[in-house]
Each structure stands twice: as structure tokens, then as C-alpha cells.
């Protein structure tokens, strides 16, 4: 199960994304935030695996927000502006959804995030179970 948050300053977009998330069994919505500043405390107090993130928001854009994070969860940009797509992918966005977002496109993005999430967890498990050789120095 992936824990996610939604960050968007548009109430209708928040509502739609919340509805979409509720339809996907392997997603657990931790919080909806109307701006990126609200999300900072959510990220500090919770293990978040995926962020649905608007770009154009007052005070702090989604791009500025992602750049400010030391540890970046997987993230999917959700925006009305297609001209940020290249920058989004340069920041390693899982996907870039242009509003209005059809459910089938949302689902495709979530499946892509789920695949990356599973691969990341497998690598972590392999690393944790790896028996490092002991070196003895004289």
C-alpha cells in the first residue's frame, strides 16, 4: 500500500483527486493540502510514498516545493499547464497529468508509480538482507 498526499490550491481539483484515490485499493490518502507549505509538516510527520502535486500555486510552486525536499517521495504533477512538462521530467516526476484529468490517465500514472515503488522496495529488501563480508585489519 502506498501512502499519498494531494497538494493543490483548487478545491475542485482536490475533490476530484481525492475521489480518484479512493477508487484505487493500493493507495491510502494521508492528507489533502491546499498549498505546499501545509504539506511540509505532513511529510515531516508521516512516511509518504507518493505526492500528487499541482505546479501553479501561490507562495510556493510545486516545482519549488520538490526542489526544496532533501528526500523526495515519488511524485506526479497534476496541472493545467503543459509547458512545465519538460522541467517536471527533469525533476524525475513519475508522470505529468494535465487537467482536466480523465480517470484512465490517472490510473496509468498510479500504475507507473506503483511499479517504481515496488522496485524501490525490492532493492531496499535486497540491500537489507545482503550479508556484507567482514574485513579484519591488522
Regions found by a protein language model. Give the residues of each.
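Two-component/phosphorelay signaling modules centered on CheY-like receiver
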Residues: 10-31
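Conserved sequence signature across two-component system core domains
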Residues: 7-8, 33, 51
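Extreme N-terminal starter segment of soluble prokaryotic enzymes
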Residues: 1-4
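Compact recognition or signaling/catalytic modules
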Residues: 6-7, 27, 36
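CheY-like receiver
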Residues: 12, 37-126
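C-terminal output/effector regions of signal-responsive regulators
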Residues: 129-138
Amino acid at each position: 500500500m502506498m501512502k499519498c498526499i494531494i497538494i493543490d490550491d483548487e478545491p475542485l481539483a482536490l475533490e476530484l483527486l481525492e475521489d480518484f484515490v479512493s477508487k484505487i485499493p493500493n493507495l491510502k490518502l494521508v492528507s489533502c493540502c491546499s498549498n505546499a507549505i501545509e504539506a511540509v509538516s505532513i511529510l515531516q510527520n508521516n512516511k509518504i510514498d507518493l505526492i500528487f502535486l499541482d505546479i501553479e500555486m501561490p507562495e510556493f510552486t510545486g516545482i519549488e516545493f520538490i526542489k526544496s525536499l532533501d528526500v523526495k517521495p515519488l511524485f506526479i504533477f497534476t496541472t493545467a499547464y503543459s509547458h512545465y512538462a519538460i522541467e517536471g521530467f527533469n525533476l524525475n516526476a513519475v508522470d505529468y497529468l494535465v487537467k482536466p484529468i480523465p480517470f484512465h490517465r490517472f490510473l496509468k500514472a498510479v500504475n507507473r508509480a506503483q511499479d517504481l515503488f515496488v522496485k524501490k522496495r525490492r532493492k531496499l529488501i535486497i540491500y537489507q538482507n545482503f550479508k556484507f563480508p567482514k574485513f579484519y585489519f591488522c
